Amino acid sequence: MQQDGTQQDRIKQSPAPLNGMSRRGFLGGAGTLALATASGLLLPGTAHAATTITTNQTGTDGMYYSFWTDGGGSVSMTLNGGGSYSTQWTNCGNFVAGKGWSTGGRRTVRYNGYFNPSGNGYGCLYGWTSNPLVEYYIVDNWGSYRPTGTYKGTVSSDGGTYDIYQTTRYNAPSVEGTKTFQQYWSVRQSKVTSGSGTITTGNHFDAWARAGMNMGQFRYYMIMATEGYQSSGSSNITVSG
C-alpha cells in the first residue's frame, strides 16, 4: 500500500472516521468485537432479516457481520438473514461491509451475487491474524483500480490464477491498535464475472507461506466483504462455507 501518490495508497489513507475510529480499530476475536463510541461500547447483537444499518457495528444475522464507514457520503448495509447482505453507496469516503466468521481459518468459501462499483472498490475475502499481525485480502473483483504491491509470485486456485503481493502499513490503525504490520494479497488476474465464486483459503495461505509470508493465529474475523473508496455502487452477496 505504501506506493506514494497512487490510488492504491490513497484507498488506505482515507479521511478520519467518525469518533476517530477506523474499521481496524474493531477489537476482534471469537465473536466479541466491540466498537468504541462516544457513549461507551456497542457490543454485538443479533440482527433480524431485512434490517438496514448505516452506523458502525458488528453482530450476528445468521452469520457474523461487520459494517464500518468513515461517514463520508451515503452508505448502507442490508442484512437479509443467513449469509446474505446487500450494500448501497453514493459518493462514499471509505467503507467496508461483509458477512462471514468471527474468526478466520482454512475454509472453502462460496459466494454468489453481484458487485457493481462505479469507481474504486473491492469484492474480496478479508481478515486479520495475530502474532504476527497481518491484514489479508483475497480479491476476486475490483472497480477502477486493481490492487498491487511487492510481487511475490502466483497461486492457482478455484479455476483462476492470482498474483501475490505484499505491502506494509506503518503506524496504522489495526485490530490491535496503532501498529506497523504486513498486508498479504492474492489478486485474481481476471475478475470473476459469473456472479458466483469459490475461495479455498488454505490454498492462498499455503502459497503465502511458500513465499515467506508467514501468518499468525486466526483470532480475528474473516468476511466476504464489499469495500468502497470515494465511489458509488451496490452489491448483493450471499456467502457460505
UniProtKB/Swiss-Prot annotation:
The catalytic site is made up of: E135, E227
Pfam families found in the cross-reference section: Glyco_hydro_11
Which GO terms of the molecular function aspect are on file? endo-1,4-beta-xylanase activity
Pathway in which the depicted protein is active: Glycan degradation; xylan degradation
EC number(s) on file? 3.2.1.8
Could you tell me where this protein is found in the cell?
Secreted
Q: Which SUPFAM superfamilies match?
A: Concanavalin A-like lectins/glucanases
Task: Enumerate the Gene Ontology biological process terms.
Answer: xylan catabolic process
What is catalysed by this protein?
Endohydrolysis of (1->4)-beta-D-xylosidic linkages in xylans
Judging by the UniProt lineage, the source's domain of life is Bacteria
Q: What is this protein called?
A: Endo-1,4-beta-xylanase C
Write out the entry's keywords from A to Z: Carbohydrate metabolism, Glycosidase, Hydrolase, Polysaccharide degradation, Secreted, Signal, Xylan degradation
The leader peptide range reads 1-49
Protein family (similarity comment): Belongs to the glycosyl hydrolase 11 (cellulase G) family.
PROSITE patterns, sorted: GH11_1, GH11_2, GH11_3, TAT
PTM text: Predicted to be exported by the Tat system. The position of the signal peptide cleavage has not been experimentally proven.
InterPro entries for the chain:
ConA-like_dom_sf, GH11/12, GH11_AS_1, GH11_AS_2, GH11_dom, Glyco_hydro_11, TAT_signal, TAT_signal_bac_arc
User: Where do the record's region annotations for Disordered lie?
Assistant: 1-22
